[in-house]
Amino acid sequence: MNYLKKLFGSKNQENIPMEQERHSQEEIEKAFNKSMDKLNNFKRIAYIPTTESNQASFSGKSKIGGLPYLRNDNDWPICPNCKKNMQLFVQLNLTELPTNKENGLAQLFYCTNSEPHCESDMEAFFPFSKSVECRIIETNSESAQIEPNINELFEEKLITGWTPKDDFPHFEEYDQLGIEFELEDDVYELMEEREIGLPIEQDKLFGWPYWVQSVEYPFDRKTETQMQLLFQLASEDNLPYMFGDAGIGHLTQSPDNREELGFGWACY
């Protein structure tokens, strides 16, 4: 990364006088401001969920983990590999979102069974795996209630509120977005310190994906349109699950078809 060097030249690291060090900090600040001027054109609002532990119940409330809303006794998705019910990872009541309100529930189910190891057997880290169920359903009555065939149900955390926060694209997306600058290390550290200019790593609604490896948007299987982030799940944030080695998962949605959902994750 040579963004600062191009702008301001190389720095002598030996015996830097105080005045020169002050100028160096000024140069970093100028580079930071110049970077933010460009990145602000791509700023989105993400929403951080406020959660509280809840006794698991079949309901149509927004939640992470726990028990889902079921339309009937056969509505809980079953993994084709182990024949057990999949864990509910997240359920969003779309009428209660802070923005882009719609009817229905968005649900993400994921098989966490380790014997057999369905995650690897079914390549659940890739979108559209058979051991993952992403769907939008309507709620027309009270939820059905069943005893799931699942090893250990995850704790239910109700989403009780949303905190808006500025969110910015990952540097891996700069080329695709036409952002023409190289993110200098000193500027990146300043962004981290001020918590601005970077994608949020934690659980969030909307915003920009935090890519652990590279840009991995799925595409609508009919229209081939790039899908958009609906919800991001970080390892062991609200969900008691680790995606590989501290990975991050993304529930995405097609802009062409709201029922086209996908989920994938990557780790370090």
Annotated model-derived regions:
Residues 3-268:
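Preference for intrinsically disordered or flexible, low-complexity segments
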